[in-house]
């Protein structure tokens, strides 16, 4: 997996994702095998994402390494791998939980995030990420610092629970 570092203020949409992919210099991407300049578009898959505007289906680009044959999805940093809930929403839910606030209020800006989604985010945080953040003194906000710290210490996006290799590409938009 390759995560593109994007600014927090960019709204997550198919058109924004397509812009990121179309402006990407593929020869600058590095495969998990360590080689650069060998990744080519391999295909696409669809995944559901829940945003401020409701749910939508995002068509995600996959690339393949011509050297080792591994494939990688390319995701913006605003998405948590293997989750429908965006990073900003996850962090708000966790922040509200940590502060003793009504956890459902965090979802008011996300019409398709329900109570089960909230419970899942909190459960994943407590099981996989709470002690990691404490041990490295990592804070939830600002998101850009959180992303950098999690990749630096754990080679993973915050709230990523599958131990799939994930490389951060410093693309800024």
State where each predicted segment sits:
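Intrinsically disordered, low-complexity regions enriched in small/polar residues
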Residues: 19-21, 28, 46-47, 112, ...
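Short, positively charged, Gly/Tyr-enriched micro-motifs
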Residues: 69-158
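Context-gated lysine
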Residues: 48-50, 119, 127-130, 162, ...
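Long C-terminal interaction/binding lobes of large macromolecular proteins
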Residues: 1-12, 26, 131-173
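Acidic-enriched, low-complexity/disordered segments with a strong bias for Aspartate over Glutamate
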Residues: 7, 18, 53, 96, ...
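Short, conserved DNA-binding cores of transcription-related domains
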Residues: 1-79
């Amino acid at each position: 997996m390759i995560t593109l570092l994007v600014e927090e203020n960019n709204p997550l949409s198919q058109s924004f994702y397509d812009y990121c992919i179309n402006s990407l210099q593929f020869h600058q991407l590095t495969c998990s095998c360590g080689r650069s300049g060998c990744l080519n578009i391999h295909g696409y898959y669809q995944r559901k994402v829940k945003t401020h505007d409701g749910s939508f289906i995002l068509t995600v680009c996959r690339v393949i390494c011509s050297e080792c044959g591994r494939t990688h999805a390319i995701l913006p940093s605003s998405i948590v791998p293997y989750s429908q809930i965006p990073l900003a929403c996850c962090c708000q839910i966790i922040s509200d939980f940590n502060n003793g606030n009504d956890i459902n209020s965090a979802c008011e800006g996300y019409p398709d995030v329900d109570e089960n989604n909230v419970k899942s985010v909190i459960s994943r945080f407590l099981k996989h990420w709470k002690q990691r953040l404490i041990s490295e003194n990592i804070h939830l906000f600002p998101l850009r610092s959180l992303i950098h710290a999690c990749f630096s210490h754990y080679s993973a996006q915050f709230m990523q629970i599958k131990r799939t290799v994930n490389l951060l590409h410093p693309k800024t938009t």
